[in-house]
Amino acid sequence: MKENYDVVIVGSGAAGLYGALQFSDKQSVLVISKRNAEFSNSSLAQGGIAAVLDKENDDPKLHIEDTLIAGKYKNNPKAIEVLVNEGPSDVLRLRELGVEFDSDPSGKMLMTLEAGHSRHRIVHHKDFTGKAVTDTLIEIVKSKSNIDFVEDTLVFSVDKAQNGFYIGMLNSDHSITTVSCSYCILATGGIGRVYKYTTNSAIATGDGITFARNLGAKLMHLDRIQFHPTAFAAEKDRERFLISEAVRGEGAVLLNCYGERFAQNYDERGELAPRDVVSEAIIRESMRTNSENFYLDITHKSPDFVRERFPMIY
């Protein structure tokens, strides 16, 4: 590790890793991972990546509209346009880099359906897409001569300097290091771990939000926290094992304690309504039945299909 870099990236999930690869070999980059990079929140993502790649059956305008509806039209339109318009080329780039998205015999990427989407536009690698993406990117990033990669290192301060930033780090050996950089990218992910129960990795503690605020950034919509509706029941465990959105995309239905479907009673989109809507439906049904027992039923699919499509969950 050097004393000065052109760019320091705080966070080693998909965003941080992919961002590191956007710089030329002449620019020095430092990527800092709070723990072993293999345990990022991105590596836990199961379902896949939404992108309009099937122009015959899908359209970017539909993807934009789906996103606006899911966000109750409080979204940032410019951010949505970037997501929708740049997403397809980024997915194709990931494939070029070596990510093996599930494909048919002809090589065409398979796309599934997920909640909030009106079309099949989710590319995936079985039910561990995040791991497939991050494992590929980690290998490439670590091979780059212009990129230094440090793991098990906690960034505790990001301060303005005359020509950039100072980054304060607590290393794995408990020593403290400070490096300077011209530019700093905060890619630290979400804040799921501040809640009692979560499917998030232990590192999702909102560090980047704090750094940005301390540097003068204006924060908004901090109440818009996304909760995943489905996880394995584990009463004594804070960490819950995620059951992918894609399971419902493949037709799984939610059942209450009486074995009855109920999601459609709260929203006509049923199990494929946006996550906040499905989560609210589960809570309201729990209050109605005075029970916290719920089931996700995919028995209409064969065991072989479930084993092949969702090997990690199985």
Regions found by a protein language model. Give the residues of each.
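Short hydrophobic core segments
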Residues: V8-V10, V179-G189
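Glycine-rich active-site loop/strand segments that organize a redox cofactor
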Residues: A51-L83
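Conserved redox-cofactor binding core of oxidoreductases
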Residues: R95-S175, Y183, A187, A231-A234
